[in-house]
Amino acid sequence: MAPVLPVVLPLQPRIRLAQGIWLLSWLLALVGGLTLLCSGHLLVQLGHLGTFLAPSCSFPALPQTALAAGTVALGTGLGGAGASRASLDAAQYPPWRGVLTPLLAVGTAAGGGLLTLALGLALALPVSLNQGLEEGLEAALAHYKDTEVPGRCQAKRLMDELQLRYHCCGRHGYKDWFGVQWVSNRYLDPSDQDVVDRIQSNVEGLYLIDGVPFSCCNPHSPRPCLQSQLSDPYAHPLFDPRQPNLNLWAQGCHEVLLEHLQGLSGTLGSILAVTLLLQILVLLGLRYLQTALEGLGGVIDGEGEAQGYLFPGGLKDILKTAWLQGGLAHKPAPEEAPPDEEPPKEVLAEA
């Protein structure tokens, strides 16, 4: 059987190959560690912002997959660096001969598969992030008033912290607060006619006002923050509703969070692409180095040329050999076949 993609490797190219693999392996370990840091950072960010994502959003799968892929890449890089360094010394290489095959198998199957999957998620999942933030922020605004409802007691605090930290207001702007009841019922006087009129003015029976929570206010504004009657042009003589309100955060939280998370996922995707490229180069180099040294008995400075290859034969030949070996393993040879047992003498006598 002819080997797949054979390469003739004299002495000096073998040494340069081992040295190059050593350098690439350390780069892979470095980038793998960077992948761990970036995916861990994104996972922590999603832990803080998970309240504002819809439960059906699958975006958190990206940092989880990237975390596993970075771990395998880091291990592959460290293993490749150790194996390539040991290959330069005939006394140190024998212990690594039994490690290289499992390392190549795990690096190809687990590392390559996880990196490819994580890179695909980095390209595909940011599209679903838009809808996930839409639904999550809509629910967050609707539950802002539920400070005494079990399971939603922290909704107000989390939304206020989000708007203050990311300098945003509402979902797409401060007017989003006009369409939801954000004042808790415990602060409403049912005997107040204005409260009754506002509740009866909509079919949902909500207390709707043209105001915003305090967390929408920009503390750097030189003027006092205007929070109520924002749609009434006569309520605030110095405020024109048709002009940008410098007292309130101009951007909506959807736009800010989408840009923030897509930026993190884009950075992680770029690192994953570099990691996948280095993983392929290291695994290919290790495979050629392994097969070349096997032909020399594990001695890199052995006399003569060595041939490195990916597979000892084509895919068809490999499958055929495996099939034949599997069939022969279950079929005993003629000389090993057990002799036919003779029937008991009692049975012969009765016959």
Swiss-Prot record:
Q: What happens when the gene is disrupted?
A: Knockout mice are viable, fertile and grossly phenotypically normal. 50% reduction in maximal rod photoreceptor response at 9 months of age. Progressive thinning of the retinal outer nuclear layer becomes evident at 1 month of age. Evidence of rod photoreceptor degeneration, shortened rod outer segment (ROS) length, increased ROS disk diameter, and progressive disorganization of the ROS at 1 month of age, leading to near-complete loss of organization by 2 months of age, however organization returns to near normal levels by 4 months of age. Rod photoreceptors progressively die by apoptosis.
The alphabetical list of record keywords is: Cell adhesion, Cell projection, Disulfide bond, Membrane, Sensory transduction, Transmembrane, Transmembrane helix, Vision
Any one GO BP annotation for this protein: protein homooligomerization
Regions of biased composition (Basic and acidic residues) lie at 342-351
Q: Which GO terms describe its molecular function?
A: protein homodimerization activity
Segments in the Lumenal topological domain? 45-64, 126-263
Q: Where in the cell is it found?
A: Photoreceptor inner segment membrane; Photoreceptor outer segment membrane
Q: Outline which residue ranges sit on the Cytoplasmic face.
A: 1-19, 85-102, 287-351
> How does this chain sit within the bilayer?
Multi-pass membrane protein
Assembly and oligomerization: Homodimer; disulfide-linked. Forms a homotetramer. Forms a heterotetramer with PRPH2. Homotetramer and heterotetramer core complexes go on to form higher order complexes by formation of intermolecular disulfide bonds. Interacts with STX3 isoform 3B. Interacts with SNAP25.
Q: Which family does it belong to?
A: Belongs to the PRPH2/ROM1 family.
The protein depicted here goes by the name Rod outer segment membrane protein 1
Can you name the source organism?
Mus musculus (Mouse)
